Amino acid sequence: MRLIILNLLSLGITPSVVGHSGPHRQETQNLNNFLESNAINPAAINGETRHTGGVHLACAILEASNQTAVVFPSDGELYTQIDKAHASATAPKNPACIYTPNDVKGVSLGVKVATFVQAKFAIRSGGHSPMEYFANIDGGVLISLAGIKTLEYNADTQTQRSGFGNLWQDVYRHVNAQGRTVVGGRTGSVGLALTLGGGLSHFSNAYGWAAQNVLSYEMVLADGSIVIASEEENSDLYFAVKAGANNFGIVTHIVQRTYPLGKIWGGSMIFPGNASAQFMAALADYQAKGQLDKKSAILPYVGLIADAVVAQFSYLEPVERPEAFEAFYDIPVIQDLTQVWDTFAAMVTAPIPYNMTRFSYATTDLLYDKEAYLEIERICHKYIPRMRKLEGGDIMLMPQPISVSMVGEARARGSDPMGVADQPQLWFVVSSGWNLAQDDAEAESIMLDALAEVEEYTKSRALHLPFYFLNDAFSTQMPLQSYGAVTYGKLQAASRKYDPTRVFQELVPGGFKLV
């Protein structure tokens, strides 16, 4: 608290402590000064709200600043609609209010208000994460970035500036119209916060991780200041935010490199579930040979109970059934939805025929080994009987082959905080899906038990790698620490420098924290 007070004093603001024994004259003046310094009429905040303080005062101040930007539970369906704008039904909570600013100054105000009254808050971009409290909060302020919709292509620099209220499909549509693309999400419905966790893309084989193709981040820091983080400005912050999640501030915009792109081939193939072992063998063969073609990429979903394997293929030229994927062509196909697409945006917005009401996931990393790929698939099959007991229960595997070229292309574009080993490897995700909230704990337990047995096996064969991809990590995993002691120390140093009062460690409870 002392550090918070010192920080506010440095801003010329004396913190209010309303809500303890009634508003005293000095406390009232402190609050009035804060309101006036932010162009808010003190008369807009009534005495009862001043006395209550905390999150209720924060919501009232934000409403006074922009009435249309704040939604309360009393707003009924509108509140529910915004609150539940998440990919998984595990994520919505019950925030005291939802604040949706439409520009970076509004985001800055949200942070300053929450800090001044010491109200806990969450930040939501696309809302893709299923983890509790990562992008929502109970009884605090939810700052939604849905109003930050900037889309600007600079033809002179061939760069794209995008607001964090966009989804990747919005960015792709905008930049594809220029005959260009960015390195972004593999499905169009994912948000831009993917670039705060490295970011795996269909373009990674050619250009590295998504974050390594971000030239600058526009951020709001804990004191409300707006800064640019890039190689030239605040380079230590730039390094940290590329894979450090929400520990340093709120990112509102990114500027990305773009690359030329015309028509492409890709889409989904659906294979029968009883071909899952054959698919894993083909995946290993693809990684050994086909993935050497940097234009190729694959995103597999192996549903063990849904009895289907769905693979999304991508090839960065309009070549029908490219040779890179020949390992998969001998597997029986239920449905082939691949085609030549006019734009990448059209492909990633096509629905993937796999959906779960409630889901979660956890990740592990292992070195390339065909025998191991087959064995970890067999291990996960053992957990089917437990999952079948849950309504809508399924176990889905996402075996993501990582090539040496992905690592090399990422490093070629600057310092990579993730420190991924330059060896062929598999980022292996075990995901659980189910229907009922009452089954949350059991569904996650099954998933984690399966993953633990997978790791026990890979460690026994000296294949385990101690890296956890943040964007696929479960809430109890420790991806930040998995970057190694040197990088983790740099993240901690950046946090101390840019958030000395620990706002994003203590007032923002969600996400992977620095300890």
Curated annotation (Swiss-Prot):
The modification Pros-8alpha-FAD histidine is found at residue 128. Bifunctional solanapyrone synthase; part of the gene cluster that mediates the biosynthesis of the phytotoxin solanapyrone, a causal agent of early blight disease of potato and tomato. The prosolanapyrone synthase sol1 is a polyketide synthase that produces the octaketide desmethylprosolanapyrone I via sequential condensations of 7 malonyl-CoA units with one acetyl-CoA unit, and one methylation step. The octaketide backbone is further methylated by the sol2 O-methyltransferase to yield prosolanapyrone I. Pathway: Phytotoxin biosynthesis. Its cofactor is FAD. The gene is sol5. This is Bifunctional solanapyrone synthase. Its EC number is 1.1.3.42, 5.5.1.20. Disulfide bonds: none annotated. Belongs to the oxygen-dependent FAD-linked oxidoreductase family. Residues 1-25 form the signal peptide. Glycans are attached at residues 66, 274, 355. The keyword Chloroplast does not apply. Keywords: FAD, Flavoprotein, Glycoprotein, Isomerase, Oxidoreductase, Signal, Virulence. InterPro entries: FAD-bd_PCMH, FAD-bd_PCMH-like_sf, FAD-bd_PCMH_sub2, FAD-linked_Oxidoreductase, Oxid_FAD_bind_N. GO terms for molecular function: FAD binding; isomerase activity; oxidoreductase activity. It catalyses: prosolanapyrone II + O2 = prosolanapyrone III + H2O2; prosolanapyrone III = (-)-solanapyrone A; prosolanapyrone III = solanapyrone D. It comes from Alternaria solani. Residues 91-261 form the FAD-binding PCMH-type domain.
